[in-house]
Amino acid sequence: MADQIEIQRMNQDLQEPLAEIMPSVLTAMSYLLQRVSETNDNLSQKQKPSSFTGVTKPSISIRSYLERIFEYANCSYSCYIVAYIYLDRFVKKQPFLPINSFNVHRLIITSVLVSAKFMDDLSYNNEYYAKVGGISREEMNMLELDFLFGIGFELNVTVSTFNNYCCFLQREMAMLMKMKSLFLEPSSFKISSKTKLVMYPHEEDSLSTHHNKKQLAAA
């Protein structure tokens, strides 16, 4: 309880700085997810059947899909970083289900849904997220459950873990811009100063293994 109070106090100080970096963070997330998806599309891998895998690739880009979620979900800034952490946990625990163009959209909407429910005091229900994500409520319910089992119900995120991932995403974006290898357009994400930021850390994670080509932090 004391840790939660300390984190909530810290969130008040983090709110404005986090608002400033969120456009870059979200753009980096879009780029990294697309890069991982395209890389795994070209790999010959044995992949187990999954509710996340679609028959065809969605026509909407990862960038546009994340923009749509950001526009309509109205969840706290931290939810997107925590969703990224959850996705990284998912690919580590599910080595035979790498992120690719056939499952990345469903994984994104589900990770944000789970993150918002865990992080925020108030969040939209599954039916609303299903409409935002372009799927049915029944499918959203199934994806949520499968995702929770996929990450072993490991929802807690420590402050240090959150900060590490946030810094990683910022560094990735800065490096991409410096190398002029970022092919996405400048961010169009708009940040509201009224968004509440809440975190509930209970564990320590490590970024030491984030260089596997199937993982989100892969180079």
UniProtKB/Swiss-Prot annotation:
Protein name from the UniProt record: Cyclin-U4-3
Gene Ontology BP annotations: cell division
Superkingdom classification of source: Eukaryota
Alphabetical list of InterPro entries matching this protein: Cyclin-like_sf, Cyclin_P/U, Cyclin_PHO80-like
PANTHER family: CYCLIN-U4-3, PTHR15615
Keywords: Cell cycle, Cell division, Cyclin
Expressed in which tissues: Expressed at low levels in roots, stems and flowers. Expressed in the shoot apex, leaf primordia and young leaves.
